[in-house]
Amino acid sequence: YMKQILSLFITSLALCTACTSPKGSDTVQVAETTTEQTIQKASSAIHYNAFSHNDYWRERPLLDALSFRFNCVEADLWLIDGELYVSHDRPEPNPAITFENLYLKPLVARIQANGGKVYPDSDRPFYLMVDCKAQGEEMYKLLKKQMEPYKEYFCSVDNGEYKEGAVLFFLSGDRPKSSLPKEN
């Protein structure tokens, strides 16, 4: 039993490392001694503690993390000319890397396809972390506006009461520290 747990741990660690390698870096290979069955077991479990840091560096942002069944992704956002772009450094405007196109629309499509859940076999919310790179107050206003059509899919607080949704959204970085505590 302990050997099986150790094998699952090693496989999960290898998968996590492979998922967190930025584009262009060497791919981490799962050890040859790991059996196909162990890989299958590890990849079928939802990795609630796995976090796809700088997720937009993946070949398929969001989708790679979901295929490895990670339960949290991070997207760094920049506000440029009234649009939210996903990038670690300030990007050139490009519709292919907008927050809505890379994260909101694909997440909502998946939730709709899975009966209101990111993972059909889990009742726990998926975590979407947004790191505001600059202009926190202005960015937050636009984020709220962009997320409004999708609000039914997100966890929320209404009059002090928590309502669970398929996705728990949270902010880091240059977040609007003064206005957020006043939000409901």
Task: List where the protein language model places each region.
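Positively charged n-region of N-terminal signal peptides that target proteins for export
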Residues: 2-5
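Bacterial N-terminal signal peptides
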Residues: 7-16
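Phosphate-group recognition and catalysis centered on beta-loop-alpha active-site segments
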Residues: 19-184
